[in-house]
Amino acid sequence: LAVVQAISSQTVRTSATLPMYSATFAGRIKALSVAHDILTRTRWKGIGLNELLENVLSPYLVAGGSRISLSGPPVLLPARSVVPLSMAVHELATNASKYGALSDPRGRVSVDWSVDEDADPQVDMNWHEHNGPSIPEGTQAGFGTTLIRRVISQDLEGRVELDFAPAGLRSYLQFPLRTSVQLNDLLGGAQH
């Protein structure tokens, strides 16, 4: 519940209106709920990356005309990666639907990943937006972007590169398939 409280307080700080708060908060809680549904269904044993993406992105994966393509080898994510990655992907999709490729009927998003199989296997995941509105120069990162950076770097012990290129957002997420850190507070201050 502390995570929900933290999501609420951070969302209220960055929402200009009550309807904006309500929609943003509901979306974040839905992403958290999807992650916990996955974990319950798998008895906290993890899930395939493709399945996680399909679950989180289901509102955008329309039968017969998907605007999001997913491509990569089978990857089993450990249970403790499910919530942070779900939250990060939700924020990418939300930002794409508000400001990026998914805000334009012609826009598309491609998500691809690979696994670097060295002594410490890690996932390299790319989110690339196409045919959306151009991103104005000097675009500032909002709270959603801050959340993406936090959950990937702190909770997954990974790294994030976000390129707000005029042609569309390019995101690179890299994280190990094992994590030694338990789910940290998602938003900077919540304990659970």
Indicate residue ranges for each PLM-predicted region.
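Short acidic helix/loop segment immediately C-terminal to the autophosphorylated histidine
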Residues: 8-19, 43
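C-terminal end segment of the histidine kinase catalytic
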Residues: 173-192
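Glycine-rich nucleotide-binding loop
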Residues: 133, 165-172
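Short beta-to-alpha transition helix within the HATPase_c
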Residues: 22-38, 42-62, 112-114
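ATP phosphate-binding glycine-rich loop and adjacent ATP-lid/helix-beta elements
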Residues: 133-161, 191
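Short beta-strand/loop element within the Bergerat-fold HATPase_c
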Residues: 106-120, 129
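Conserved short strand/loop->alpha-helix "switch" segment adjacent to the catalytic nucleotide/phosphoryl-transfer site
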Residues: 62-108, 139
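Conserved transmitter core of two-component histidine kinases
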Residues: 65-73, 125-127, 161-163
